[in-house]
Amino acid sequence: MSYPKKVELPLTNCNQINLTKHKLLVLYEDMLLGRNFEDMCAQMYYKGKMFGFVHLYNGQEAVSTGVIKLLDSKDYVCSTYRDHVHALSKGVPSQNVMAELFGKETGCSRGRGGSMHIFSAPHNFLGGFAFIAEGIPVATGAAFQSIYRQQVLKEPGELRVTACFFGDGTTNNGQFFECLNMAVLWKLPIIFVVENNQWAIGMAHHRSSSIPEIHKKAEAFGLPGIEVDGMDVLAVRQVAEKAVERARQGQGPTLIEALTYRFRGHSLADPDELRSRQEKEAWVARDPIKKLKKHILDNQIASSDELNDIQSSVKIDLEQSVEFAMSSPEPNISELKRYLFADN
């Protein structure tokens, strides 16, 4: 049974957010890539090209794009089992992510990780993690080494920022509280991004937490806790920009609670029978991609033809990614134990 509860999203005046045409189109293209990549994953999964659990990100694109597109190449991102789109936003090539989902040697994890373990050292993408909260200590460690390099090893340059993504269900786990405490104690350059999509598999968020407003939990540890409309990429970017600047300047962590919603079931094996039709329709009406498209067209920032060209480019990219994945070799069975240890 679904327990729908109307979620009031924080209001943001997008017209007060001044971004260049180029930056806006980068955001639009990144969200389109994420959405269409996940749709292609669903097609390939049901055709038997992918195996195991596959968790899709449809509906939550504004969070990934709004945060990650503010980061530099040297910054870090740590994800969850719903990790494909985070990797794409960080710059991991779509063909290598697709090949990983196919279990091929050309995948970003050499075909050993699959859907829940996307990883790319060249892009400082620290990976997806199959169990909730696993990534938070890893992300905290990445932020700690950034401080250590600057303060102890006296390496020049700016602090590297870490963005750590996790869901609402994770915030009842011990690692969440422990790492918030450490991050504040050591003023770590980390942004904790809670993608509150209202459901932890089949558990409605408001039924699982004594304080449903996750951002309020930051107060106990002495760091800023900010709630944002996770269906609005410009609102997310505005909040994340301040968090990145704060981290980069050595002022410590920020907790961002992005109110969002997944348009598909928990995984492709989930029939999605627990959520009501009314609840899903209300959130789908807030589609972040359609919202940004309307903003661009209403303000005459770009034409429909330009946006259609972006859509076509994304479609071609994904078709090529599937062709690449299908034509790539399987891992050699003789190398089954390779990559288990650092010397490999």
UniProtKB/Swiss-Prot annotation:
It is found in: Plastid, Chloroplast. The lineage of its organism: Eukaryota, Rhodophyta, Bangiophyceae, Bangiales, Bangiaceae. Heterodimer of an alpha and a beta chain. Keywords: Chloroplast, Magnesium, Metal-binding, Oxidoreductase, Plastid, Pyruvate, Thiamine pyrophosphate. The pyruvate dehydrogenase complex catalyzes the overall conversion of pyruvate to acetyl-CoA and CO(2). It contains multiple copies of three enzymatic components: pyruvate dehydrogenase (E1), dihydrolipoamide acetyltransferase (E2) and lipoamide dehydrogenase (E3). NCBIfam families: PDH_E1_alph_y. Thiamine diphosphate binds at Y81, R82, A130, I132, D168, G169, N197, H266. Gene3D superfamilies: 3.40.50.970. This is Pyruvate dehydrogenase E1 component subunit alpha. InterPro entries: DH_E1, PDH_E1_Alpha_Subunit, Pyrv_DH_E1_asu_subgrp-y, THDP-binding. Its cofactor is thiamine diphosphate; Mg(2+). One of its GO terms (biological process) is pyruvate decarboxylation to acetyl-CoA. Its main location: plastid. Mg(2+) binds at D168, N197. One of its GO terms (molecular function) is metal ion binding.
